[in-house]
Each structure stands twice: as structure tokens, then as C-alpha cells.
């Protein structure tokens, strides 16, 4: 193991695995280690025994009424994939889609006045949705048509405004949209966690609305897709990509020491008495407690249910509910993701609802009450509170590139933005999300091979 | 596709210790060649080949380990949903046979319930240095309901036969993977992935 690597990656969470894969495909020599004996770190999906042990320790076994442990693949960090979003672009860029199977999420809901409604996102839906009051229908329809037609580089579609300057708040006012409508546009379509976007230029929000609409248009039921067997498949798939392009994988590797050799400009990493060197380290925040800072807490509550949730369409085997902050007098949104055996994450008949939110009070679980009220009887509950951690420095000075922990958003856009930003800091170049030339080369070779055989 | 053959596609994974000849077996089967010094698996770890039976065509989507077996870091995703597995050992190495048995147990515990497992004692061309007796492996395979063959990727002995036996044993039912309603993730802009349908002639 006495070797030099371009990059050593520590931790096999999703972000680390995507970066490891991208760097290996680029031809970098990568060593990827994890102190745990399994892939995924915080982004792993657990079976019931693992989940139970995490909350209750080893002594007590999970009750048999929960069903077979191995039928469970429970995400610790619940998120859905926007089907036209950045993660899909990264999956295509690397051809990692071939290792995974996805299904569409059945429904997307937003909470309003104590009940949940399907999210209207097109001009026609705006007219029929019960969420939209009679007086709001016409202005909303006009606004949706404006957004649909908006093209960044075509001023004729900008309604005479400079939307890189005009705030979203001003744009909403121009269209005469009232608070309830603004609330669902900002939080259920543009997917903002809080209201700070209102004072930002309108362009970004419009692009996020278009992303939602594009994603919805792909598979029509909802804008989200989700992999069979849980999100824990994603880091494993990117790790496989990295391995295929020469990355070396080692699990169960505790890191004992990391020394910076200023003179030779290398970093020495020691694990189990063996030392390897590298130019750069990429890792999750847990590997450098002295180089990161806490920025708030996130609560995630995993609820096992014995049937579909009573507040939504009973036929739906998977869905998302967004609870906008103002609806429940909070400063940030709350999310509920519901999954079932349709995505191979639990036994038949069971449903998993995961509620997540940024912690705002000293009694975080009480904050989740409005979400719990939507779920019906809960058979078993696993509640976790975790810190949101960010690196203090950007890594360019010490060559240690640390990812941010996974935030409370319901999708992977911020996750991928962090990955793209890290990639740029690590390599000095932008990540271009078209299919990678090295992947194309391999695809072509495989194609030629098939033709020869014919 | 001018015959009326039904085509069934299956995911097949290779398992076994490093350097027992997993990649060589696949390359012999898919490309019909053998390299004395096959490099550790890099780059192409996803191959396809078809086997024609009487009235059906079986297309194998073959997953190689990408070297992740070296430090025992193969991810569960690798054999997830696999309908067939070839567990390979080197007939000159008892350790590799022990490791193969561990893989069989892992597949029985974590793999798909109806997975077809084949045990392959590879490097039959080097039988002079044999350490694992045919009868011993045969008996283990029978007791555990595995297909069993000794193979040589170098001489091609029993390689096609092994895949044909697996193809015969696989259930030919329309939905072979869990979770109906899966969606294809295709590029958003100019959707040309260059995937071609093919069948044997």
C-alpha cells in the first residue's frame, strides 16, 4: 500500500462517491477509503436490523410485526430526484444510469390550510386546482404562461423587465399574486426552503420553476424519480464507476493520522499502520472536525406505517408533501416523503414516511406535529437529529476539500451544486455535464464490438 | 429479429477471489479470445452476450467486479437483482474455493430468492497443479443446488457450455425483475445513446 495517489477520498457518502467517480474517469489515480464496513456513510439505506440497532442498541430485536429485515432499505437522508435535475445529468454524464433502476414517484402535494393538495404546475392545472381560489386563477394562469415562455437570452419574453435585477417579490406583485399562491410557488414549485428568495433577482426562481415543470413533463405523474432499493444505491453505483476507471476501494479503514508535508507538497495518510501519500484529499466533514463548523440542526423522523397515508390518494405508492413554512408558522419548510414496496424499500403492505425539517426550537420533535397529523397511525418511529456542517475554508490553501453535510431540502440540487463546486476547486475546471468523452469512447467500443458480432 | 424467438434478458454477476479468471471467462465467452496476462479489470466492466436455446434467446447482461473484490469491497448493489451468478475459483487454490463457498452463502442470504448460481472451477488447463478435487466441488454444488463445471478460459473448455446451462435453468417468465413500471433515464437534449437491438443469427 506504499503508494502515491493523485487524490485520496475519505468517506463513501454520495458526494464523495460522485467526485471519486468523476476524478477516476478523468484519469486521476484515486484511493477511496471509509472507516465503516459498508458504503454510503450518511447516505446509506439501512435494513430493519441496522436501523433498529442504531436507535435501540443491540440487545432488543426489532419486533416481528415489522416484517423481514432484509426487505427494508430505509434512507437516513430522504430526498427525491428531480427528473430533469442535476443528479440525472450527472448520472447520464457518467453512464451510471445503467447500474440503477428508477421509478417515478406517484404524487407531489403541498400543504395548505390544514390539508394537502396536489401541486398545480401548469396553466391548465392552475384553473382546475382546488388550491387556487377563484380570484387567483386568472393571475396565476397568466404568470405560468409568462414563466413557460421565458427564455433567458430572448428579451422579448421578459415582459419589459430586467429579471436579473427585478426581485421575485416585485414580479409576484406585478402579477397580482396573493400570499397563499406566492407561498406554494416559492416552496412547492421553486422548492425554496425559506423566503429569502423573494428579495433575490427573479431569474433564479423562474429557472427553478422551469426545472420543476420540465421534470414533471418527463414522466407526467410527478417531477420526481427514485431508485429501486433506496438512495443508498446511488453512492454504490458511483463507487463502481470509480472502480471501473481504476479507483481502489477499501472499507473498514480507520484513519489514524493525516500529516501535511509542506516541503514536498504532499499529504501523508495513515490507516492501520500503513502510510500512503497524495496531492489532494476529498472527504466528508467527519474526517476533519477541526476544519469544519456547525450551521444548525436537521431533524429527520422515519415512520413505519401499516398502510397508505389517509390524507393522500390511497392508490399512490410514493409521494411527497411539502409543508410551506408560513402554513405552520415556521421560518423554514417541512417535508414528508412516503415510499413503499413499489420501490423495494420495505415489505409489501408497509409504508415508510420520512419527515424532515430544519430544527427551529428546543423541542424539535414537537415541530413535526403537523406532519405527523397527516400520516395516520404510526407503527414505529425512528427520530434522528443531526448537525448541518460546513467546511471553514474552500480547500484551495491546504488541498483538503470537504463536502457540506446533506441539507434539509427534499431533492438533490444543492447536493449536486456542492459536488460541482468542489469539482471546480479540486481540478480548477468546470464540470461540463454532457456525456464524458472517456465514457463516449467506451460506449463506442462496446457498440463496435456488438456490430462485429453481428 | 426475423425469427419468432422470444428474447429474455438477465443480469449475471461474476464473483470470486481476485485472479481466479473471472474476466477471462467473460472475455472468452463474449469475445472469444484469451490473454495470458489479462490486466486487472479496468474500463469495460459491463458486457452483453446472447445464448440461443431452441425456442428462446437469452441475453446476458454481464457484470464484472471492476476489481472491487480485491479488498472485499464489492457493494451489495453489484449482485442486487441479479438472476444469475457465476462463482469462480481456481482449481489450484483451496483458498479460492473457500472464498467461493463464502460467496455462495452471501448470495443465498442477500441475493434474489430464485437466483441461479453456477460454481466454476477455472484454469482446468492447469489441472496438473490441481488442489481442489472435482468430486469435492461437485458434491458441494449438488448439496447446495448449484450448477457446476470445471472450465478453462484459456482453452475455452466448458465456457460456452457453462453459460448455456445457466441459460437453460433460468425461468423464462415475462417479468424477471421486481418493481414493474421502471422508467428509462435518457438524455434530455439529443437522445442518441446508440443502443442497438440484436439477436443471434
Curated annotation (Swiss-Prot), chain B:
GO CC term, one of those recorded: plasma membrane
Keyword annotations: Cell membrane, Endosome, GTP-binding, Lipoprotein, Membrane, Nucleotide-binding, Prenylation, Protein transport, Transport
PANTHER family: PTHR47978
Name of the encoding gene: rab5A
MF-aspect GO terms: GTP binding; GTPase activity
Motif Effector region: where in chain: 38-46
UniProt binding sites for GTP: 16-24, 35-41, 64-68, 122-125, 152-154
InterPro entries: P-loop_NTPase (IPR027417), Small_GTP-bd (IPR005225), Small_GTPase (IPR001806)
Entry's localization field: Cell membrane; Endosome membrane
Keyword Nucleus tagged: no
Protein name: Ras-related protein Rab-5A
Function: Required for the fusion of plasma membranes and early endosomes.
SUPFAM superfamilies, alphabetized: P-loop containing nucleoside triphosphate hydrolases
GO BP annotations, alphabetical order: intracellular protein transport; regulation of phagosome maturation
Regulation of catalytic or functional activity: Regulated by guanine nucleotide exchange factors (GEFs) which promote the exchange of bound GDP for free GTP.
Lipid group attachment sites (S-geranylgeranyl cysteine): 199-200
Similarity comment: family membership: Belongs to the small GTPase superfamily. Rab family.
Membrane topology: Lipid-anchor
Signal peptide limits: none
Main location: membrane
Domain of life: Eukaryota
Amino acid at each position: 500500500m506504499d503508494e502515491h495517489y493523485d487524490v485520496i477520498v475519505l468517506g463513501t457518502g454520495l458526494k464523495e462517491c460522485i467526485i471519486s467517480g468523476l476524478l477516476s474517469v478523468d484519469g486521476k489515480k484515486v484511493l477511496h477509503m471509509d472507516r465503516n464496513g459498508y458504503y454510503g456513510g450518511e447516505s446509506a439505506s439501512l435494513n430493519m436490523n441496522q436501523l433498529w440497532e442504531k436507535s435501540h442498541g443491540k440487545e432488543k430485536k426489532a419486533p416481528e410485526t415489522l416484517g423481514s429485515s432484509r426487505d427494508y432499505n430505509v434512507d437516513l437522508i430522504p430526498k427525491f430526484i428531480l427528473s430533469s435535475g442535476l443528479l440525472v445529468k450527472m448520472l447520464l454524464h457518467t453512464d451510471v444510469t445503467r447500474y440503477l433502476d428508477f421509478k417515478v414517484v406517484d404524487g407531489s402535494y403541498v400543504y395548505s390550510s390544514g390539508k394537502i393538495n396536489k401541486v398545480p404546475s401548469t396553466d391548465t392545472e392552475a384553473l382546475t386546482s382546488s388550491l387556487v381560489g377563484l380570484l387567483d386563477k386568472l393571475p396565476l394562469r397568466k404568470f405560468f404562461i409568462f414563466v413557460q415562455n421565458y427564455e433567458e437570452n430572448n428579451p422579448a419574453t421578459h415582459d419589459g423587465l430586467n429579471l436579473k435585477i427585478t426581485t421575485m417579490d416585485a414580479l409576484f406583485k406585478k402579477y397580482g399574486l396573493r400570499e397563499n399562491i406566492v407561498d406554494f410557488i416559492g416552496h412547492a414549485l421553486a422548492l425554496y426552503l425559506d423566503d429569502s428568495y423573494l428579495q433575490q433577482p427573479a431569474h433564479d426562481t423562474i429557472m427553478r420553476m422551469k426545472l420543476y415543470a420540465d421534470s414533471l413533463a418527463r414522466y407526467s405523474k410527478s417531477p420526481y424519480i427514485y431508485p429501486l432499493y433506496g438512495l443508498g444505491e446511488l453512492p454504490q453505483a458511483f463507487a463502481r464507476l470509480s472502480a471501473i476507471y481504476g479507483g481502489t476501494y477499501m472499507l473498514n479503514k480507520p484513519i489514524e493520522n493525516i500529516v501535511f508535508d509542506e516541503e514536498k507538497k504532499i499529504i501523508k495518510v495513515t490507516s492501520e499502520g500503513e502510510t500512503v501519500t497524495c496531492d489532494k484529499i476529498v472527504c466528508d466533514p467527519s474526517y476533519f472536525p477541526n476544519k469544519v463548523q456547525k450551521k444548525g440542526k436537521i431533524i429527520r423522523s422515519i415512520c413505519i406505517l401499516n398502510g397508505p397515508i389517509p390524507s393522500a390518494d390511497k392508490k399512490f405508492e410514493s409521494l411527497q408533501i411539502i409543508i410551506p413554512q408560513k402554513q405552520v408558522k415556521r421560518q423554514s419548510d417541512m417535508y414528508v416523503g412516503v415510499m413503499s414496496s413499489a420501490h423495494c424499500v420495505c415489505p409489501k403492505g408497509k409504508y415508510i414516511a420520512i419527515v424532515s425539517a430544519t430544527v427551529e426550537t428546543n423541542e424539535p420533535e414537537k415541530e413535526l406535529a403537523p406532519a405527523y397529523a397527516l400520516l395516520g397511525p404510526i407503527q414505529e418511529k425512528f427520530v434522528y437529529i443531526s448537525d448541518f456542517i460546513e467546511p471553514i475554508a474552500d480547500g484551495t490553501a491546504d488541498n483538503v476539500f470537504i463536502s457540506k453535510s446533506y441539507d434539509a431540502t427534499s431533492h438533490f440540487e444543492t447536493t449536486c451544486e456542492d459536488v460541482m463546486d468542489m469539482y471546480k476547486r479540486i481540478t480548477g475546471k468546470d464540470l461540463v455535464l454532457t456525456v464524458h468523452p472517456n465514457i463516449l469512447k467506451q460506449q463506442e467500443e462496446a457498440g463496435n464490438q456488438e456490430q462485429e458480432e453481428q | 429479429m426475423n425469427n419468432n424467438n422470444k428474447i429474455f434478458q438477465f443480469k449475471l454477476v461474476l464473483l470470486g477471489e481476485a485472479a481466479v479468471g473471472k474476466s477471462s471467462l467473460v472475455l472468452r465467452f463474449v469475445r472469444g479470445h484469451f490473454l495470458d496476462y489479462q490486466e486487472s479489470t479496468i474500463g469495460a466492466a459491463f458486457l452483453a452476450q446472447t445464448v440461443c436455446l431452441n425456442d428462446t434467446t437469452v441475453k446476458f447482461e454481464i457484470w464484472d467486479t471492476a476489481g472491487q473484490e480485491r479488498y472485499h469491497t464489492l457493494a451489495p448493489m453489484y449482485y442486487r437483482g441479479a438472476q444469475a451468478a457465476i462463482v469462480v475459483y481456481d482449481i489450484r487454490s483451496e483458498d479460492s474455493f473457500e472464498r467461493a463457498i463464502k460467496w455462495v452463502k452471501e448470495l443465498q442470504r442477500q441475493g434474489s430468492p430464485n437466483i441461479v448460481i453456477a460454481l466454476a472451477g477455472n484454469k482446468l488447463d492447469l489441472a496438473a497443479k490441481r488442489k481442489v478435487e472435482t468430486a469435492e466441488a461437485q458434491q458441494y454444488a449438488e448439496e447446495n443446488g448449484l450448477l457446476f463445471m470445471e472450465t478453462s478460459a484459456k482453452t475455452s473448455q466448458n465456457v460456452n457450455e457453462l453459460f448455456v446451462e445457466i441459460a437453460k435453468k433460468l425461468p423464462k417468465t415475462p417479468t424477471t425483475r421486481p418493481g414493474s413500471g421502471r422508467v428509462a433515464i435518457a438524455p434530455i437534449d439529443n437522445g442518441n445513446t446508440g443502443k442497438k437491438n440484436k439477436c443471434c443469427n
